[in-house]
Amino acid sequence: MDRVLEWYRKKCRLEESRLAACLDVVRGVESRIALLAAERAAIERELLARAAIPAADFANLGRYRLRANKEELELQVERRRRLTEADEQRARVRRAQQRVKLVEKMRERRLEEYTAAAGRELENLAAEAFLARWSREHEG
């Protein structure tokens, strides 16, 4: 039973480490989204802070905004996909934790049954010893 429990614990730790990796990926995507937003704001601030803005720069800003919007949408899609993966992994972790708890309870129950059986056996031996002693004392 101990080997089974240890195997389930190892499996649970493995699932937990996979969840941590999933969450790291989510944080990485969120970081890329934040960096893109900061870059976009900095470029727009820099351009709009100029006294005179050439028409070509406005055209370039428009193209940049389109590309940045497309990239942000792609990152948001990736973020949702990664969050879904993390939720699925979180469910696997919960199932693994439940299996560990179940095996622990089974082990405890088996120990209680063993202890109770050992106690009954000890009582029977004590009763037999008492009866044997009592029988010897009252025969003679």
Residue ranges and their predicted role:
Residues M1-G140:
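Charge-rich amphipathic alpha-helical interaction elements
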